[in-house]
């Protein structure tokens, strides 16, 4: 489930304020029920926490990826549920949330106010990568050092519990969202078109396979 969640996040890479696709993320966030802090987000607000929350909403995982539009209120939820890791030298797993404090002075454990959040998408040796919404106004990744500067701590969604009987929910709104992005398929379409179609169908919860051969 960790891998599935991260793979879904990768589909949003490149969504930005410039191309307007960040609005799609915020729209998903605003359909969370009940809406955190009873606050409907505007498209002009910071949207890093809303991005990981929207991911949880899209995958029906809000019981484990606690939704919030505030980084600090999100931290409080992980602390309350015993899913918080304070240590900067913690080696994260993919799917964990990394919180940042840009005022970190590297004196002891960072316990300041959180300014930003993303989801760990890769771990290799003493480094890890984090996928983030609202990173320079778009969704993209950042490389970090374990026990590095600016780490406020980690939120640890309980994927083991969430995975029991889990299936990715079908969201028919994605058909409208992605309409026009996938070419119509004919017998003579090339394999790339087929691959794009399979990505769409797999994203909707269907098993369209992974090969790119279009059989008659």
Explain the meaning of each model-derived region:
Residues 1-61, 168-187:
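N-terminal capping segments
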Residues 138-147:
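A short macromolecule-binding patch
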Residues 147-176:
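Low-complexity, Gly/Ser/Thr/Pro-rich intrinsically disordered linker/tail segments
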